[in-house]
Amino acid sequence: MTGIGARTAWRNAVGRRPRNARRVSRIAYRVSRVACRVSRIAYRVSRIAYRVSRVAWRNVAPAARRAHRPFPAVIHIASGIPLPTEPLPAPPVVVDRPASPDDAALIAPDDLARLLRGEHDDPFAVLGIHAESSARDVVVRCLLPGAARVELIDAASARTLATLSPVGSGELHAIRLPAPGPLRYRLRAHYADTVRDLDDPYACTPWLGSLDCHLLARGEHRDAYRRLGAHPCVHDGLEGTAFALWAPNASCVSVVGSFNGWDARVHAMRKRIECGVWELFVPGVGCGALYKFALRTRDGDRLLKADPYARRTEAPPRTASRICAPSAFGWRDDAWMRERAAAQSAHAPIAIYEVHLDSWRRHPDGRAYSYDELADALIPYVAALGFTHVELLPIAEYPFAGSWGYQPVSLFAPSARWGEPDALRRFVERCHLAGLGVLLDWVPAHFPQDAHGLARFDGTHLYEHEDRRVGLHRGWNTLVYNLGRHEVANFLIANALYWLREFHFDGLRVDAVASMLYLDYDRDDGQWLPNVHGGRENLEAVAFLRRLNETVHADAPQGAITIAEESTAWPMVSAPVAAGGLGFDFKWNMGWMNDTLSFMRVDPIHRRFHLDRLTFGLLYAWSEQFVLALSHDEVVHAKGSLLAKMPGDAWQRHANLRLYLAFQYAHPGKKLLFMGSEFGQEREWNHDRELDWARLADPASAGVRRLVGDLNRLYRRRGCLHRRDADSRGFRWIDCADSHQTVIAWRRIGDAPDDFVVVVCNFTPQPRTGYRIGVPAAGFYRELLNSDAADYGGSGLGNLGGVSSEPVPMHGEPHSLSLLLPPLAALVFAAPGH
């Protein structure tokens, strides 16, 4: 046998076994390593489970650790599922032996010190009723500053069971009791001048359910206003108010108010760490009580904040929130709510009267009208003028009157300036019963820096961006919402739904959308941060606006609309989200407003050089669902009233205004007019004064108002003036190039080709005789409106009620009309047979 063969035989006989054994040992070693790692992971999981169980023991299941106290059935508000309950409690235990000082001193010195300083982050771990480790005794502790003596009494019979002993300075009282069975108790506090029987808030179960916490943490709780804030309710069989506040970075939070002497030590709140919300149910506190939240920041600062979800507040300049009961208002506007989707569609006539409630009309002593008084006066006034909608400047509570409501602090509270919330509901209902829709100006773009508001709410930049290049609006000195934080976006979307659901508003006009869309809005180079792609588009705001519109259209009552105040050329603002748009129903046409007002300011002798300012808007009129807005922004800040913008003497200024309003109503787009413009107020709007109603004694002003009423009725009655506002087939120029005579003419066309009106506008004070325009059909063209009619304060020139066509080709049409054009006037003619 060769050497090679011998080695092979040896390996076959002996050598492989040791190698296999080594392999097996290596595998066994690796398996043991894996097992060791698994055991370490299991140990860590057990540690985490232990910590979670401790949190749950402290914060979620106090009933299990407080003398095994059984609670009545609690309905999980978010899910509607009743939680299981234990049997009814046994009769209360009567304590025979007196309490001793040793029994009372059952609190760690550190816990006592933090309670007395109002700095305890887990009051439920100390206050209330707690089982001792032996499970044979319980300890009851309560913090009642000012109480000379505190007794434990039977909840059913009010019998005194024991007297608690004061601890330390005497503001904390405590006692140890034997606990052979369940104990249901109340506290009887003896003060210097009164005795009060109290239910212990620290013996109550949590207010928020697990589903609430889950949805709040994800920013998907569309009913957040029904869980956060202050809610009078029956909880654990007790009447009181549940308080809940999102302040994840605060070290401790208390609710303070008129019910506890504004003492932050009395009602310290429990933190739900899974969502960053602090909560406490306070028995015996009811509607009307004033309150705020006292927060201690991680830096040790103390803050006193109004409730972001408060549904009522004190009237400014006071800043406390007020507990408000759930409304039991019995709405009677079902018919309107069913039909409003059609009344607010893109094909419907929409003519909006914009109102600032504080300055529309006032009492002789200067007081503003209340909601009910406005309903008595404003609704019939607007309805008589033929408007379809009222739009209210922001009414969410705001501290600074000079902001007109555009710097709100309490977004869920109708301003107390004009009454209580149900009075606002009555106003909206009466508008609906009168056939008027109600739109609300809504401000999600920014908020003021008032100390009691949202700024640095829990000591951190909770609602706003931390970087001032994103979080500060320099033009308004306000803070910008951090829309990329889902809790903040949820706060705003829940607020939008709140107004639409709870007050039956028919839509929201969303303020300052352009400032939301652009990161460099009103910022110089170096003062803004680009997005992740290096651009200036605010991607978080785009996502928020799309989500807002989708939510409103899905979850608000049917037919609610959204309108964007967007002043740039951002595309597809009113296109559906599914098509790549922002999802608004309508967009203010700021370009039309700026161009046409600049034209009207020009002296008529020079207008022929600027005719493009009137016609340019028709190049993009079909790109969006537009609202032609002549709003409050155009009559303030030294801009003058609409009438003051018009050139010429008094007669010419009124004639120009009448012409401009007629031009607006005959132009494609929905209509909006700010209060006072309907009668040609001469003075610039002042938010501290009512409108100049005395001007209606002037025939010229009365004539302007009469014209506005007739324009509204004509606009609503003639389908060709509104059905195809965003359809190029609904408009056709007759002549847009007669700059020499400064005259333009067009047709508005309805669903049928023969349903149209002819509009002719003369923008000079020179009457035009024999002015010929082409028309498509032969027949008599009845004059529907003449802004120069004597009834409106004009000269009375016109066409004697109408004109018959002549077979003279003009402007590419086989027929034409020979017209007398009054000075500074608009004429509207109906098609033959219409």
UniProtKB/Swiss-Prot annotation:
GO terms for molecular function: 1,4-alpha-glucan branching enzyme activity; cation binding; hydrolase activity, hydrolyzing O-glycosyl compounds. The active site is at D511, E565. CDD domains: AmyAc_Glg_BE, E_set_GBE_prok_N. Coiled coil: none annotated. The keyword Glycosyltransferase applies. GO terms for cellular component: cytosol. Keywords: Carbohydrate metabolism, Glycogen biosynthesis, Glycogen metabolism, Glycosyltransferase, Transferase. Pathway: Glycan biosynthesis; glycogen biosynthesis. Pfam families: Alpha-amylase_C, CBM_48, GlgB_N. Belongs to the glycosyl hydrolase 13 family. GlgB subfamily. Monomer. HAMAP family: GlgB (MF_00685). This is 1,4-alpha-glucan branching enzyme GlgB. It comes from Burkholderia thailandensis (strain ATCC 700388 / DSM 13276 / CCUG 48851 / CIP 106301 / E264).
